[in-house]
Amino acid sequence: MRNFKLLLSTIIIFPSISFAQADNEIQVYASPTIGKNLTIFELHSNYTFKGIKNLPNPKSAHYLNESLEITHGFGDNFELGVYFFTTIAPNGKYEYLGSHIRPRVTVPQSWKWKIGASLSAEFGFFRPGTNESYQWEGEIRPVIDKTISNWYFSLNPNMDFMLTGPDKHFGFGPQFKTVYTIQQKVGVGFEYYTALGTFKRIHSFNEEEHLLGPMIDLYLNPKWEINGGFLFGLTPNSNQQVVKLLIGRRIGK
């Protein structure tokens, strides 16, 4: 899954592209994998209302990203997902940007850990736009979460990597989510996304990406997954206003 991994090195090399649009999938993971023989189809949508500060052309940030994620459970603790990344550019052009695969394993409940934990490894090809070359990239995402009464907390200390192209790196961008559930129907809270730099160099605060905003989860039906939110950039190199929506549908028995 492509998450907030746009680092300072990308800013230097591709300043007009790096923060012209939000990432294609904006999500903090929970530790459980999908059940055995179940499949979930998820549409990740996000729109950048306002890009990084001081863009020469503010309208150049107005991308609508649409990503289809299909995940199947092959066991009680293992799933495999595939992603198809697309975008509608500010000029209205529809573009296919790439695809990833993502195996993930979770700690079995029989181990009786006091926290939930899982690990995903994502890999594939991606390009920022049709005028750019595809590059091989991916991420390693540990997931640690915990439910305490009506409160839920999840931490994803996400690590991304780029294997080809001028922006080869191994970066670090933790993500966090907390939710308070009301009558088991609605969850309200906030999500926080970062891109701090590479393992060779953590950037200064103003050079990093920090996005924070309110979110809502709807638990209307076990077959459906609905999550939405609005993110605000906390640094000049962050997109300043991004809206996100996730709609998922489970099928199978």
What are these regions (language model features)?
Residues 20-253:
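Transmembrane beta-barrel domains of Gram-negative outer membranes and organellar outer membranes
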